[in-house]
Regions:
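Ser/Thr-centric signal marking residues that sit
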Residues: 36, 85, 128, 180, ...
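C-terminal catalytic core of Y-nucleophile DNA break-rejoin enzymes
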Residues: 2-6, 59, 68-69, 80-104, ...
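Catalytic-site neighborhood detector that most strongly recognizes the C-terminal catalytic loop/helix
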Residues: 64-66, 99, 180, 199-225
Length: 233
């Protein structure tokens, strides 16, 4: 599905991941995606060097691309790519929830060891799989599918037992996290310039479109508010 998650779907999904011992290891990564609106390549490429816990700032300056090599080996590998536009280079302030998972993750890695995998001279990646490699987007999508399917089959059983309608989570891809963040942001913030900056949109019209989608009734409420404040006819 290409739609952002609703507030309820987002809450349900994250609560399920947080409580499920099989899926919990994905929780910090999903919080990061939903709390920063980063593109998937930016998120898998984030390094501890890009994270300033003291000032609570995330520096977005590159992303990782996972692709098949052109030779006969059919091997896949990561490459570092730099933002296509100046807007892609940005600094995102950390939400409290993002700060908390990063802090926790940092403490855990201090005990268990940091990522030593080297991609184009970069290392120290924050989010890695059990082999110490950065996540590849296809694996993230598989994990989301597994989580959603497991949740939905458990929910179906529970709903039958409790004689109610099941509340399902739709299947979605990792890109939807960014879309969902943008929707929540637009629902809570009216300053388009700020939204554009955090999202790293080169063109403000991209931001405007997302804003309009997230707030279909906004025109009506703006006019209503205006009429309340314009008691001057």
């Amino acid at each position: 599905t290409g739609c952002p998650l609703t507030v309820d779907q987002q809450r349900k999904f994250m609560e399920y991941v947080a409580k499920n011992p099989f899926f919990y290891h994905w929780y910090p990564f999903f919080v990061f995606l939903l709390g920063t609106g980063c593109r998937i390549g930016e998120a898998i490429g984030i390094r501890w060097d890009d994270i300033d816990l003291e000032n609570r700032i995330i520096d977005i300056n590159h992303s990782l691309t996972y692709y098949q090599r052109a030779d006969d080996s059919y091997k896949c590998e990561f490459r570092v790519s730099l933002p296509k536009t100046e807007a892609g280079n940005r600094r995102i302030p950390m939400m409290q929830q993002v700060y908390d998972v990063l802090q926790e993750e940092y403490e855990r890695q201090k005990q268990e060891g940091f990522c030593v995998e080297n991609v184009d001279g970069m290392t120290n990646f924050v989010f890695t799989n059990r082999f110490g490699m950065p996540h590849n987007p296809a694996a993230v999508n598989r994990a989301i599918k597994r989580i959603v399917d497991t949740h939905n089959s458990e929910e179906e059983v529970a709903a039958k037992k409790e004689k109610r309608e099941p509340v399902m989570i739709p299947r979605f891809s990792c890109h939807i996290f960014r879309h969902t963040f943008a929707s929540r942001f637009c629902e809570n913030e009216t300053n388009i310039k700020v939204i554009q900056e955090v999202m790293g949109h080169a063109d403000v019209s991209t931001t405007m479109n997302i804003y309009a989608e997230a707030n279909p009734d906004v025109t009506k409420s703006v006019i209503e508010k205006l009429s309340k404040n314009m008691d001057i006819f």
